Amino acid sequence: MQAVGLITEYNPLHNGHRYHLRQAQQLTNADCVIVVMSGDWLQRGEPAILDKWTRAKLALENGADLVIELPVFFATQPAHLFARGGIELLSALDCTSVVFGAEHPELDFQRLATAIAARQGSFTHYNATFATQFNAALQAATGVTLTAANDMLSFCYYAANQTLAHPMQLLPIKRRQADHATTTIAADSRYASGTAVRQAALAQDWAALKPVVPADTFTALTTQRLQRWSDFWPFLQYQLLTVDVARSGQYDQMAEGLEYRMQAMAQHATTFDDFIHQVKSKRYTYTRLQRVATAALLQLTQAEVQKAQAHNYLRVLGFTPKGQAYLHQVKKQLPLPLYTKINQDLRQHALNLDYRAGRVYQLINGQSQDLYRQPWRLPVTIG
């Protein structure tokens, strides 16, 4: 069996994602479609609108054969680290190819990645935004800048892939959904951005939402609790007001001095949005601040995140019979640990950061995210 891989968030899974899943299989004629998916906390520093188990099940119902969780210590990082974590997992699973969406798939990402490889160390620090440092280095090396989010992520996939001993085939395809910044759903459209889908769901605009998401996603959004940052604001505010500022300074992605600003603004802010707007300055993007806020909420220190990134692992969230057969084929040669459930030892050691992240999410979601959870086993028929 041969496998194609996708690196995803599915926040939530919409028609553009279903198109991506089906195109991945059709382009590669792969026997197994493997999805690496962020857990309950996402790359833009925010909670997933639906929990990871619901989103994994939706993926299996819409074309995935195997869903692997991208650990929180990669899932909540800037693009280059998010990409590295996902590429590592797909490579470990012996994927032949990786398919991903880009705004401009015609770009020669391989040439750009090769040209800038020697400069990577110059944009892996947190003193300025990743995008700013990245584009400065890319402009100096190639004369090209990448401004679209998925073009930048595509570049990062190429950069991560070329560090592998056996690089995979990378296949960028044109995104079918609207641009991420688009916040409205166009009339008579079957595709919408993730931002527009989330806003419609949170506003309970079901009429606008129904045409742009699969039926099972629509059911999940209309019947389950939907999470947003405002739900977690009291917990974040408590952390910032009670944790010693020296400890706050150790949180992942925290820039020097930002911990004092965050603590001061937490004294007066009444909502999460109010807090972020008060902390915002020209030096930091909203996404960067949300990632720091996520690290503060989950008490993720830079030291423990960097240590964990050196010990990636394969956490199975679900599979179809094809996915199960593929796992059986490769499991004896896996270079990374494979986990299907969390026990006491894993909770305290190897998977402790993901357990912590899930436990905080569970405060609002109300559903166990790790303990007593078994991977989904879905014999799915795609209509």
From Swiss-Prot:
Biological processes per GO annotation: tRNA modification
UniProt cross-references to Pfam families, sorted A to Z: HIGH_NTase1 (PF05636)
Recorded catalytic activity of this chain's protein: cytidine(34) in elongator tRNA(Met) + acetate + ATP = N(4)-acetylcytidine(34) in elongator tRNA(Met) + AMP + diphosphate
SUPFAM superfamilies: Nucleotidylyl transferase (SSF52374)
Claim: Magnesium is one of the keywords in the record: no
Binding site for ATP: 7-20, 101, 150, 175
E.C. number: 6.3.4.-
Subcellular location, principal: cytoplasm
A GO cellular-component term linked to this record: cytoplasm
Function: Catalyzes the formation of N(4)-acetylcytidine (ac(4)C) at the wobble position of elongator tRNA(Met), using acetate and ATP as substrates. First activates an acetate ion to form acetyladenylate (Ac-AMP) and then transfers the acetyl group to tRNA to form ac(4)C34.
HAMAP family: TmcAL
Family: Belongs to the TmcAL family.
Entry protein name: tRNA(Met) cytidine acetate ligase
Gene for this chain: tmcAL
